[in-house]
Swiss-Prot record:
Ranges of residues in domain P-type: 68-118
Protein name: Lysosomal alpha-glucosidase
Residues making up the propeptide: 24-60
Entry EC no(s): 3.2.1.20
Residues noted as binding substrate in the record, renumbered to the chain: 391, 587, 603, 661
Span of the signal peptide: 1-23
GO biological process: glycogen catabolic process; lysosome organization
Organism of derivation: Bos taurus (Bovine)
Gene responsible for this protein: GAA
Length: 937
């Protein structure tokens, strides 16, 4: 039996979802009456289709009359046999059309041979009623489908929540069904003005959502029948464009193919490869429309599902349970779509400053002595290192919250030494808890058993699987008692070993046996009538039984939330244990994950293909509100090469989360392992990242408080330029920096797209003033682009980074840790537009405290340049950041040599001007938290 918690549980923001629906004939919300031929089968046809007593699953309530209107174009067909292959006779028994079609070139799946006719019976819209927040209606079905346990009467609630957000649910009014326990906004009145209009088809039921601005149809569910059976829900819609992204996690291009593509969402432990379900599930997509417009759609459903894309273009959601809970975001531009999505699922957490430094790990640092030596080697080679990690090696028998007294006997002292050196420490923590020891020998299991925190099997006993420590039980993080138990375990272990963050792995959850060591029951949860395209051919492949019981529901419903709920528990536990900003990196994710944790992209291979694929992966997770994301630099599986590792380090310097990690028995790949030439190239990339950390930290602040992205695709900034829509091997940091990495072997040039505007090579900024880099070789210092592809020089020691005209970025002298770099002098790079304008921002606090915004313990500055004058605007100043010392202002785009430079009305005599690069370098001695004015003439 499912155990339902009271509505007051902290995660149950949707426990009592707001219920409203759209009705026609009011304002712009017109109820369309569809033509007679589209209304479905007549009662006579229904009677002829299925005589009383018919029991065949192909006939159960389904019309047998030969369908008409089967002359649909192949790309506009919607599959009438999603569950299995069927014969022409079985297809017609379902009331569908059968017509063979060729497999399209380069398609992942074929066009359906058995497909719905336009007249296929669906639901009918009835009892339309106006409510305070929108409208409500009843949906009734007269003819059952070919799936068991159809729900014949449904309730439609539609909420016009905001100007740009429309929300509707379809659910069973008679029986409570599982709903995702994600806290979402509540509204109590209808938005007075909207960017959308809504129309309805009465029979067959359908919803059409249009953008008022141009009348474009964004959502049209009339293209295929609605299914709502107990274990099969299908909602299809047309798409206004083939340019669609989202629906993570998958390995591939940022833009999805609409050429018959199926994306499966069921979190799975598997090394990333194309066309398989990976570690996370994010049922959200964003569509780019003509004219720079965009919209997004979010299906708040955590059950196993397929999402099918077809060339018409159209999309079909196929879920195995829950309800249909749909949000539509009107933008109107892509940036706003992302922010509106994050308004629903939550803005990202603010990471500690040190978390943006370099992290180093590998599976195989088998002793504390080896771990110490790695840190020492990094220091001797003059490579920055902020956070040292350990994999399973530190554990006693690979059990959580223990350490090996033989190989890590001085583990607590080692961590203290890292702290004394200005560094931090993170270790792996898997969710599975060893269950095989004698009672009283392993406190996490003993306490968990006593407190009832584990997922249970059909007998009510803890489900036992097998993971790294052997036999294991799995904590149920939807149980409030489990959150408290996890907090206790984390706090107790932290009292022994003062770690600084948690790396939560294997949390799909991963299991080395199918389901459990005792197998799984033979029931409809284990063998659903519709099985999405999961790797392994069963829901229990590499995980636990779908029918196992959790506090909120069955694992069948909650599987995709496991990583999210563990991230929340770990986030909360770290706050309790440390009293400072938590740092959690998780492998498994779901919508809203960025509120609690970052993500790394899993067990990637050390090859050029996976290096290249990491760029769209980083971009996609930023669109999904998980900006703290990165891939294992140099690759995890297999052996890297020197050139690959150099290029990966250069790109990795621009991952929001920068970590080098590799597998047991792989060749070592720490930066100091390579030739001096390679080391110097890597050192330049490290230096560049550390110099730019103030800008990166400011971007994370903006993501945290405004729902912005950190790393972002070009189309987010330039949506009106269609050439940017498919660019996914370059990335932007915020609005200002364009990174064009080398992603292929043996290349000394790289071609990138430069949107319209002026772009300054960042190497023309005199960072040698920091004493860290030699002056750059002569380069093409500025690109005046009309929107074009540009081939750039990219020798092995170079990653191309360009600063966009109109922007100002803060920089700081580098060091081997952020503890030291935060003490260095600041600099500002000012990139002028043709009209001589630019602006930028700096956010600064102590880098790790909680509640700095509420307490006012931060400094926020706005920088403005106009009319040959540069000023700082003091938005908020506190002791944190007020005393930062500014030593250099570099102005790019100064066309003529200045005769005079003034700083606070005092002449600056030692400024320099380079006519070749149009660069004005102004040495200053200023305090950032005090008003200043710099001018040149």
């Amino acid at each position: 039996m499912m155990r339902w918690p009271p509505c007051s549980r902290p995660l149950l923001g949707v426990c009592t979802l707001l219920s409203l629906a759209l009705l026609g004939h009011i304002l712009l919300h017109d109820l369309e009456v569809v033509p007679r031929e589209l209304r479905g089968f007549s009662q006579d046809e229904i009677h002829q289709a299925c005589q009383p007593g018919a029991s065949s699953p192909e006939c159960r309530g389904s019309p047998r009359a030969a369908p008409t209107q089967c002359d649909l174009p192949p790309n506009s067909r919607f599959d009438c046999a999603p569950d299995k292959g069927i014969t022409p006779q079985q297809c017609e028994a379902r009331g569908c059309c059968y017509m063979p079609a060729e497999w399209p070139p380069d398609a992942q799946m074929g066009q359906p041979w058995c497909f719905f006719p336009p007249s296929y019976p669906s639901y009918r819209l009835e009892n339309l009623t106006t409510t305070e927040t929108g409208y409500t209606a009843t949906l009734t079905r007269a003819v059952p489908t070919f799936f068991p346990k159809d729900i014949m009467t449904l309730r439609l609630d539609m909420l016009m929540e905001t100007e740009s957000r429309l929300h509707f649910t379809i659910k069973d009014p008679a029986n409570r069904r599982y709903e995702v326990p994600l806290e979402t906004p509540r509204v109590y009145s209808q938005a007075p003005f909207t960017l959308y209009s809504v129309e309805f088809s009465e029979e067959p039921f359908g919803v059409v959502v249009r953008r008022k601005l141009d009348g474009r149809v964004l959502l049209n569910t009339t293209v295929a029948p609605l299914f709502f059976a107990d274990q099969f829900l299908q909602l299809s819609t047309s798409l206004p464009s083939q340019h669609i992204t989202g629906l993570a996690e998958h390995l591939g291009s940022l833009m999805l193919s609409t050429n018959w593509t199926k994306i499966t969402l069921w979190n799975r432990d598997i090394a990333p490869e194309p066309n398989v379900n990976l570690y996370g599930s994010h049922p959200f997509y964003l569509v780019l429309e003509d004219g720079g417009l965009a919209h997004g759609v979010f299906l708040l459903n955590s059950n196993a599902m397929d999402v099918v894309l077809q060339p018409s273009p159209a999309l079909s959601w196929r879920s195995t349970g829950g309800i249909l809970d749909v949000y539509i975001f009107l933008g109107p531009e892509p940036k706003s779509v992302v922010q509106q999505y994050l308004d629903v699922v939550g803005y990202p957490f603010m990471p500690p400053y040190w978390g943006l430094g370099f992290h180093l790990c590998r599976w195989g640092y088998s002793t504390s002595a080896i771990t110490r030596q790695v840190v020492e080697n990094m220091t001797r080679a003059y490579f920055p290192l902020d956070v040292q990690w350990n994999d399973l090696d530190y554990m006693d028998a690979r059990r959580d919250f223990t350490f090996n007294k033989d190989h890590f006997g001085d583990f607590p002292a080692m961590v203290q030494e890292l702290h004394q050196g200005g560094r931090r420490y993170i270790m792996i923590v898997d969710p599975a808890i060893s269950s095989s020891g004698p009672a009283g020998t392993y406190r996490p299991y003993d306490e968990g058993l006593r407190r009832g925190v584990f997922i249970t099997n059909e007998t009510g006993q803890p489900l036992i699987g097998q993971v790294w420590p052997g036999l294991t039980a799995f904590p149920d993080f939807t149980n409030p008692e489990t959150l408290d138990w996890w907090q206790d375990m984390v706090t107790e272990f932290h009292a022994q070993v003062p770690f600084d963050g948690m790396w939560i792995d294997m949390n799909e959850p991963s299991n080395f046996v199918r389901g459990s060591v005792d197998g799984c029951p033979d029931n409809s949860l284990e063998n659903p009538p519709y099985l999405p395209g999961v790797v392994g051919g069963t829901l229990r492949a590499a995980t636990i039984c779908a029918s196992s019981h959790q506090f909120l529901s069955t694992h069948y419903d909650l599987h995709n939330l496991y990583g999210l709920t563990e991230a929340l528990a770990s986030h909360r536990a770290l706050v309790k244990a440390r009293g400072m900003r938590p740092f959690v990196i998780s492998r498994s994710t779901f919508a809203g994950h960025g509120r609690y944790s970052g993500h790394w992209t899993g067990d990637v291979w050390s090859n050029w293909e996976q290096l290249s694929y990491s760029v769209p992966e980083i971009l996609l997770f930023n669109l999904l509100g998980v900006p703290l994301v990165g891939a294992d630099i140099c690759g995890f599986l297999g052996n890297t090469s020197e050139e690959l590792c150099v290029r990966w380090t250069q790109l990795g310097a621009f991952y929001p989360f920068m970590r080098n990690h590799n597998a047991l028995n792989s060749q070592p790949q720490e930066p100091y392992r390579f030739s001096e030439t390679a080391q110097q190239a890597m050192r330049k990339a490290f230096t560049l990242r550390y110099v730019l950390l103030p800008y990166l930290y400011t971007l994370f602040h903006r993501a945290h408080v405004r729902g912005e992205t950190v790393a972002r695709p070009l189309f987010l900034e330039f949506p009106e330029d269609p050439s940017t829509w498919t660019v996914d091997r370059q990335l932007l940091w915020g609005e200002a920096l364009l990174i064009t990495p080398v992603l292929e072997a043996e290349k000394v040039e790289v071609t990138g797209y430069f949107p319209q505007g002026t772009w300054y090579d960042l190497q023309t900024v005199p960072m040698e003033a920091f004493g860290s880099l030699p002056p750059p070789a002569p380069l093409t210092s500025v690109i005046h682009s009309k929107g074009q592809w540009v081939t750039l020089s990219a020798p092995l020691d170079t990653i191309n980074v360009h600063l966009r005209a109109g922007h100002i970025i803060p920089m700081q002298g580098p060091a081997l840790t952020t503890t030291e770099s935060r003490k260095q002098h600041m600099a500002l790079a000012v990139a002028l537009t043709a009209s001589g304008e630019a602006q930028g921002e700096l956010f600064w606090d102590d880098g790790e405290s909680l509640g700095v915004l509420d307490g006012g313990d931060y400094t926020q500055l706005i920088f403005l340049a106009k009319n040959n004058t540069f000023v700082n605007k003091l938005v908020h100043v506190s002791s944190e950041g007020a005393s930062l010392q500014l030593r250099n202002v570099t102005v790019l785009g100064v066309a003529t040599a200045p005769q005079q430079v003034l700083c606070n009305s005092v002449p600056v005599s030692n400024f320099t001007f380079s006519p070749d690069t149009e660069t004005l370098a102004i040495p200053v001695s200023l305090t950032m938290g005090e008003q200043f004015v710099i001018s040149w003439s």
